[in-house]
């Protein structure tokens, strides 16, 4: 009983998951504790709690980015990947260093393939989203899906990850989220009968396996 699922798990650990047979790290995620309402002091206190619990990693979830439209909720800021100055005046580096001093690893939340209409990115590049020109846009979690068939969008998504890893090499983990299905299915970049290429290009983005 249950042998099929156990066989699948064994196959996944052996062939699909990186270091699948190693012990998994435990983590404390700030999301349920703070949602979007946090600052440096709250996060460092949660790190102390993580250390006390014997947890291996602290994960900073959604809400740490954007300044023109600060990420105070899920209705704005997605796409603008600079630290919110009011929440994190010393930047992500301050938090990675705090975690390092406490002997735990640091992870961070991203969702670079999505965008809020209320964001600087959308204001500059409305043509970067998947949408049907002759229909109203449909929003899921107040966001739209970026068109990864467009090389400029591919470069942008890669740049989000590359910039964080370059600036903050002590980031040990990305929680790469995907909070919207693909709606508004149409690419203004691709020619007719080529929209399946979105999926092909999604698979070439730098998402961890």
Predicted regions and their residues:
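Active-site groove signature of glycoside hydrolases
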Residues: 56-62, 159-189
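Conserved structural scaffold segments of CAZyme catalytic domains across common CAZy folds
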Residues: 1-107, 113-115, 120, 140
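Flexible glycine/acidic-rich beta-alpha junction loops that bind and position SAM and/or redox cofactors
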Residues: 68-69, 115-125, 181-191
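Non-membrane alpha-helical structural segments and their capping/turn regions in soluble enzymes
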Residues: 40, 44, 85-89, 93, ...
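Active-site-adjacent "subsite" loops/lids of carbohydrate-active enzymes
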Residues: 112-163
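Conserved small/polar residues in nucleotide/adenosyl-binding loops
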Residues: 203-208
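Acidic carboxylate-rich catalytic motifs and surrounding loops in phosphoryl-/glycosyl-chemistry enzymes
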Residues: 110-111, 209
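Glycine-rich tight-turn/loop motif centered on a GG-T
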Residues: 74-86, 188-201
């Amino acid at each position: 009983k249950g042998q099929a699922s156990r066989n699948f798990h064994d196959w996944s650990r052996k062939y699909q998951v990186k270091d699948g047979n190693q012990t998994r790290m435990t983590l404390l995620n700030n999301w349920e504790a703070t949602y979007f309402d946090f600052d440096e002091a709250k996060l460092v206190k949660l790190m102390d709690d993580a250390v006390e619990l014997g947890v291996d990693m602290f994960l900073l979830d959604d809400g740490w980015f954007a300044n023109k439209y600060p990420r105070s909720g899920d209705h704005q800021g997605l796409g603008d990947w600079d630290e919110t100055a009011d929440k994190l005046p010393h930047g992500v580096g301050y938090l990675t260093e705090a975690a390092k001093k406490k002997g735990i690893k640091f992870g961070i939340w991203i969702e670079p393939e999505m965008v809020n209409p209320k964001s600087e990115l959308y204001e500059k590049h409305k043509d970067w989203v998947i949408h049907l020109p002759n229909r109203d846009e449909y929003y899921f979690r107040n966001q739209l899906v970026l068109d990864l068939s467009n090389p400029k969008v591919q470069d942008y998504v890669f740049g989000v990850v590359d910039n964080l890893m370059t600036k903050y090499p002590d980031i040990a983990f990305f929680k790469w989220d995907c909070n919207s299905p693909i709606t508004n299915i149409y690419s203004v970049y691709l020619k007719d009968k080529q929209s399946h290429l979105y999926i092909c290009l999604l698979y070439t983005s730098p998402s961890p396996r």
